[in-house]
A protein has these predicted regions:
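Conserved N-terminal entry element of GNAT/NAT acetyltransferase domains
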Residues: 1-14, 153-154
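C-terminal "cap" of GNAT-fold acetyltransferases
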Residues: 109, 113-121, 126, 133-154
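Conserved GNAT-fold acetyl-CoA-binding loop/helix
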Residues: 21-47
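Hydrophobic pocket/interface hotspot
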Residues: 16, 49
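Conserved acetyl-CoA binding element of GNAT-fold acetyltransferases
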Residues: 74-86
């Protein structure tokens, strides 16, 4: 098995978008209503993901030539970490997080992220602490629940 962590390139945009969308579409319905899943789509458009790649914010984990994990960062903020469902529970999420944290902790004393309900325990097990519970009104009497979490270097 060949595993490579690297900065995403513009050629990776479609696959990174697929990793995010496919994972969200498979996992989120077990935790969120259809309205919430559709609301999240606004923040995960192809254009946004492509822009983050062009700005050097996005990383990918490539296994045997296939992008299986993606994650982005801006300064000390980690965002959009997704592992294809068929690769979850095999350490690939931990691998990309290790690398993102290494980059961040080289320049910052802490890192932050917003954790979806399915990811909260994963981040807690990595040493993240919840600093705020968020209940975001998405309209029509619906809300989205997530955590803002922080990990301190050390």
């Amino acid at each position: 098995m060949k595993l490579q962590y690297r900065k995403a390139t513009s050629d990776d945009a479609e696959k990174a978008y697929y990793v995010v969308q496919h994972t969200k579409d498979v996992i989120y319905p077990d935790y969120y209503t259809r309205e919430v899943v559709e609301y999240v789509d606004r923040y995960y458009t192809f254009e946004i993901i492509k822009s983050d790649i062009e700005q050097g914010r996005t990383r990918v984990l490539v296994k045997d030539g296939e992008i299986i994990t993606t994650g982005s960062r801006v300064d000390n903020h980690i965002m959009r970490v997704y592992v294809l469902p068929e690769y979850q529970g095999q350490g690939f999420g931990s691998k990309i997080m290790d690398e993102l944290e290494k980059e961040i902790f080289a320049a910052f004393d802490d890192c932050e992220l917003e954790a979806s309900l399915p990811a909260c325990i994963f981040y807690e097990n990595r040493g993240y602490k919840t600093v705020k519970h968020v209940k975001e009104d998405i309209g029509n009497g619906k809300c989205m629940i997530y955590e803002i979490m922080r990990k301190v270097k050390g």
